[in-house]
């Protein structure tokens, strides 16, 4: 099965660049919750193209990404992609990571409970687990679910429904 984002890596980054104010808002939130990661072992689950990681010092950040297209870009940006595949199927070292985060990737996981259990096992005692995502109960989350069912955001039935500014502009 072809990963969901293969063939869409360029569009993913382009969307954030076209919506720079939204990108900057999300980036500030990302930086705030991530905190100081110097000297820590960090894993990005669903690292995508490494766009957010490239805006911070991503040296040392490891990543797991189902899409080879996205992961290849992440590697070029400095993320050490340790696996191409779903977190649910990953065989991670126990108690290995100080920080594990999911930045917008949990809504694409087939088995969220299993994914979180894999992360829990790999997290060091007193480690930090971060999940940044759009709640499925929110208006934008509902749009994601509709687009997922339709197979695209470009489906005619979703025309004119997407909000222009889906994220908060200020944190």
Predicted regions and their residues:
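Short catalytic micro-motifs in class I SAM-dependent methyltransferases
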Residues: 104-105
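Short alpha-helix
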Residues: 164-171
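Conserved class I S-adenosyl-L-methionine
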Residues: 1-37, 39-48, 51-55, 70-73, 130-157
């Amino acid at each position: 099965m072809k990963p969901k984002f293969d063939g869409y890596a360029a569009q993913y980054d382009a969307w954030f660049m076209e919506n720079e104010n939204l990108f900057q808002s999300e980036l500030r939130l990302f930086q705030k919750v991530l905190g100081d990661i110097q000297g820590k072992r960090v894993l990005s689950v669903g690292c995508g193209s490494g766009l957010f990681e490239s805006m911070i010092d991503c040296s040392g950040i490891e990543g797991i990404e189902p899409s080879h297209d996205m992961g290849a870009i992440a590697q070029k940006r400095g993320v050490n992609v340790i696996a191409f595949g779903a977190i649910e199927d990953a065989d991670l070292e126990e108690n290995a990571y100080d920080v594990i985060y999911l930045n917008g990737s949990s809504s694409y996981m087939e088995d969220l409970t299993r994914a979180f259990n894999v992360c829990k096992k790999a997290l060091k005692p007193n480690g930090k687990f971060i999940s940044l995502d759009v709640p499925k109960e929110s208006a934008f989350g509902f749009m994601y679910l509709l687009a997922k069912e339709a197979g695209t955001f470009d489906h005619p039935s979703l025309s004119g429904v997407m909000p222009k500014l889906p994220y908060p502009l200020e944190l």
